[in-house]
């Protein structure tokens, strides 16, 4: 963005980080990224002193005055995916336009998985215990 007083350049990583944070704010988003991205993120989180990657699952294309965003998410089970996608779009567009002044031309959302609360529970049963005979 250029003015008579100088030029402001916003790095793609800044735009991606803002989009990632705005996506996480929406109720119904369990995680960002596909399974491989989340696996790498989980490994990074275990390294002492490693910083959280707020742009995980987000890719952007940034021009002089416009930006396009792609977001990969895991939705919580029971949430309307259409409503969730609409909420993500609204929040990402509002955050980016307010914070950067860029016009957001599109926010594409890919839902890679649905999170079930039971996926994290470990009640001690084995797969043999869960078989129907």
Give the positions of each predicted feature.
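Short, non-transmembrane amphipathic alpha-helical segments
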Residues: 81-100, 104
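Short, charged, intrinsically disordered terminal tails
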Residues: 1, 115-133
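A short interface-forming secondary-structure element
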Residues: 64-86
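N-terminal, polar/charged subdomain of small-to-medium soluble alpha/beta proteins
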Residues: 1-40, 44, 53, 116
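Short loop/turn motifs enriched for small/polar and acidic residues
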Residues: 74-76, 109-114
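Short beta-strand elements
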Residues: 30-34, 103-110
């Amino acid at each position: 963005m250029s003015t008579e007083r100088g030029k402001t350049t916003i790095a793609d990583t800044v735009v991606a980080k803002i989009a990632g944070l705005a996506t996480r704010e929406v109720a119904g988003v369990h995680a960002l990224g596909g399974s491989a991205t989340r696996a790498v993120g989980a490994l990074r989180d275990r390294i002492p002193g490693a910083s959280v990657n707020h742009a995980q699952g987000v890719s952007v294309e940034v021009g002089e005055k416009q930006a396009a965003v792609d977001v990969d998410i895991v939705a919580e089970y029971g949430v309307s995916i259409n409503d969730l996608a609409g909420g993500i779009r609204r929040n990402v567009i509002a955050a980016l336009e307010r914070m950067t002044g860029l016009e957001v031309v599109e926010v594409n959302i890919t839902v890679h998985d649905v999170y079930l609360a039971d996926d994290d529970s470990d009640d001690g049963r084995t797969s043999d215990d869960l078989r129907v005979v």
